[in-house]
Amino acid sequence: EQTASIVARIREKLPESEVILVATMLGNDEWIHTPREMFNRYRDELKSLVSPGVALVDMTAVWEEQLQAKEMFDLTGNGLNHPNDFGHRLYAQGVLELILD
């Protein structure tokens, strides 16, 4: 609801603006504070906001794909929920692909 409200206010004040929403990376499944279903629900809520002028970069899906071949420590700086250099590169790549598409 808060994100929807923020997007609505931006679009109201700046109707020609475009908004990029970013669904976050996954946290470590072994850590109690980052259950996977939480990230999928958040991504799905953001997807419901996609409309003309509002786009989504689905880093949740990118992380799911990466974790099929890599370990959490390959993507994170702390092994839990903060991307390392490679993880930040994935974020930048996702946003740039959207902008350049």
Tell where the protein language model's regions lie, with residue ranges.
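Alpha-helix N-cap/loop-to-helix boundary motif
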Residues: 1-2, 38
